[in-house]
Amino acid sequence: MALKERVGTVVSDKMDKTVVVAVENRFPHPIYQKTVSRTTRYKAHDEDNACRVGDRVRITETRPLSRHKRWAIAEVLSQSPKAEEVTK
């Protein structure tokens, strides 16, 4: 079985080695056909504490790492402008 992947935005980095990633899922309503947007928040493992709030990241499914963590950061797709200023 293939591992699931999601792309989302980091919304919290206040925990050690953990970030909260918000993934937006868009789909048409079954009756009204209006595009509905649902946001799901995943806790993901960030071993190096490299992610900052606003970063676009790809997360992959992994074994359970704690009570709520079942995802890990695969790669940082783009950094937020705030994160780039802090690293310089």
From Swiss-Prot:
Is-annotated flag, keyword Signal? no
Keyword entries, A-Z? Ribonucleoprotein, Ribosomal protein, RNA-binding, rRNA-binding
Drop me one GO molecular function for this one. Answer: structural constituent of ribosome
| Cellular component terms (Gene Ontology) | cytosolic small ribosomal subunit
Q: State the Pfam families in the record.
A: Ribosomal_S17
Which GO annotations describe the biological process of this protein? translation
Purpose: One of the primary rRNA binding proteins, it binds specifically to the 5'-end of 16S ribosomal RNA.
Q: How does it assemble?
A: Part of the 30S ribosomal subunit.
Q: Which NCBIfam families match?
A: PRK05610.1, uS17_bact
- Family membership noted in the UniProt record: Belongs to the universal ribosomal protein uS17 family.
What's the protein name?
Small ribosomal subunit protein uS17
Gene source species: Synechococcus sp. (strain CC9311)
**What does UniProt list as this organism's lineage?**
Bacteria, Bacillati, Cyanobacteriota, Cyanophyceae, Synechococcales
Which gene codes for it?
rpsQ
